[in-house]
Amino acid sequence: IYGPERNILGRIQSRNFTRIIKKGHFFSRIYINDLTNIILASMNKPNPISIYNIADDCPSTLDDVIDYISKKISIIISDEVLYETLSKKEQIESFFSENKKVNNRLIKEELGIILEYPSYKEGYNQIINLNN
């Protein structure tokens, strides 16, 4: 879950940021406004037997997200480390322990959801615009 108050833009802008690279590690995200709309839609169309995966349309690697943001705000991130080279204490296990691509088909079919932020690109464009 990310949005104006919860994102990695500030850490990248601080220029005190180390990129941790784990190839092939995908993660599904959702912008807070889309999450709110999905919750409201599920309350308005309750279906007790449905389980909804709440995610945008574009599972992506953290590296892809960081590349996109850094290019948009013209910051070069030179500090990077491969996840595999970190000691166990240094590993950010809560984020990197799972590798998930989530299918959001049911939120669209059953709830009629049209995502305002279908990928991290639209979401971070909004966050960057709000910070300018």
Predicted regions and their residues:
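Conserved C-terminal active-site "lid" loop/helix of NAD(P)H-dependent oxidoreductases
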Residues: D67, L86-I114
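Residue-level signal for the nucleotide or nucleotide-sugar donor/cofactor binding architecture
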Residues: I30, S60, V102, L115-P118
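Glycine/proline-rich active-site loop of Rossmann-fold NAD(P)-dependent oxidoreductases
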Residues: I1-R15, I20, N33, A41-Y52, ...
